Amino acid sequence: MITLKQALSLSQDELETLKNEIDAKVRASDLNAYIKAPSLNGASAKGVPILIKDNISVKGWEVTCSSKILEGYIAPYHASVIENLHQNSMAGFGLSNMDEFAMGSTTESSCYGITKNPRDKNRVPGGSSGGSAAAVAGGLAVAALGSDTGGSIRQPASYCGCVGLKPTYGRVSRYGLIAYCSSFDQIGPITQNVEDASILFDAISGHDSKDSTSANLKPTQTFKNLNREKRFKIAILRDHIKDASNEVQLAYENTLKALKEMGHEIVEKKMLDSHYQISIYYIISMAEASSNLARFDGVRYGRRAQNIKDLKELYLKSRSEGFGDEVKRRIMLGNFVLSSGYYDAYYLKAQQMRLMIKEQYNKIFEEVDLIFTPVAPTSAHLFNYHASPLEMYLSDIYTIGANLSGLPALSLPVAKDSLGLPIGMQFIAKAFDEQSLLDVSYALEQELDLKLD
């Protein structure tokens, strides 16, 4: 597939040809990365075609978060990131499959069915932005937008062999993103390489008065300032690596060796056990999800139950029929931790611990430029691999720290395992220092020159 950098130099006629080619490929593909062929969404604005995750509003398109409860909902306005794409010679072209309401790590909970990993169709593409990553890796998209609440851009990028960037919280507007966990959610790019990630990030970043959590900063110019000659002081967290598979640990050590040979300084640091981060993340995210999803009641928009007797039954049946099992589980647990008698014991303590984790990151960043970790404990696993929801939650162990602290992080493919599946590693940077993330990743990408096809 042509890169985003290359596509931006095409004429309008050449772009129309490219869109027709992508549409034909999607129709012929069995990956189920797109919810439907891009042309079926209606007319697309002029510009380089960018695949959009199904929780980002595109005016006139049916946007469902891959959930039955939003069946038939037509977005009445553009998300701010879509407006930003239009201002930078790009446009939405198709909606990607995802875990329902972004609650999952495998893209198995979508009401549209599973998405397959293009590297091995018997394996998951990761999630929740699995459709976006599978499409980019499978040659079905030039680039894509995803959202990252606990690793939902970085983990599928790692599983599929793409570059995935979670920007600093507040760097990219969330206006028009259908919320899962408002204090964690962030929109970001999934691309074929670091240059494309930089270009797409620059296009969507910047202050937005319609988002009260948007940082009052100008759009970034990371692509213009990309510098692979810069050298950094990079921290590693040895205690956190024990949960990774042997092959991920080997890829980690080999990448560390490459970073040292490139002239970067590696130092060891310590943090609170990452298992605590899992508990904190899920308490807070489920609490916020139970609040955010209360609006889907069958009255205002989306699916409405039929043959009901009264308003109470309308609420009950609409939500029971519309939400999938994982979403129901998180709503119930979220209501539990917010209930009288448990708010102080769980939610309040989790928020206090979240602040402590953020302070730990800030302390480390007083002495280093970047932190280097795996993205996931393993490479992409088979479908129906997790015996319990808890096992799936533990797969986020390396990614959720950046969300808890609002820091930017980037996933880069660095190796292949014994089955030829991609393995990604992650850099985390100080708040609003995406430039350093992209600089070090750009240099490492050039150094490793990994061939996945």
From Swiss-Prot:
GO BP: any one term: translation
Gene3D superfamilies with a match to the protein in the record: Amidase signature (AS) domain
Domain of life of the native organism: Bacteria
Any Pfam family hit: Amidase
EC number per UniProt: 6.3.5.7
Active site: 53, 128, 152
Catalytic activity line of the entry: L-glutamyl-tRNA(Gln) + L-glutamine + ATP + H2O = L-glutaminyl-tRNA(Gln) + L-glutamate + ADP + phosphate + H(+)
Keyword Protein biosynthesis found: yes
Tagged with keyword Repressor: no
GO molecular-function terms, A-Z: ATP binding; glutaminyl-tRNA synthase (glutamine-hydrolyzing) activity
NCBIfam families associated with the record: gatA
PANTHER family: GLUTAMYL-TRNA(GLN) AMIDOTRANSFERASE SUBUNIT A (PTHR11895:SF151), TRANSAMIDASE (PTHR11895)
UniProt family annotation: Belongs to the amidase family. GatA subfamily.
Function: Allows the formation of correctly charged Gln-tRNA(Gln) through the transamidation of misacylated Glu-tRNA(Gln) in organisms which lack glutaminyl-tRNA synthetase. The reaction takes place in the presence of glutamine and ATP through an activated gamma-phospho-Glu-tRNA(Gln).
Protein name, as recorded: Glutamyl-tRNA(Gln) amidotransferase subunit A
Gene this protein is translated from: gatA
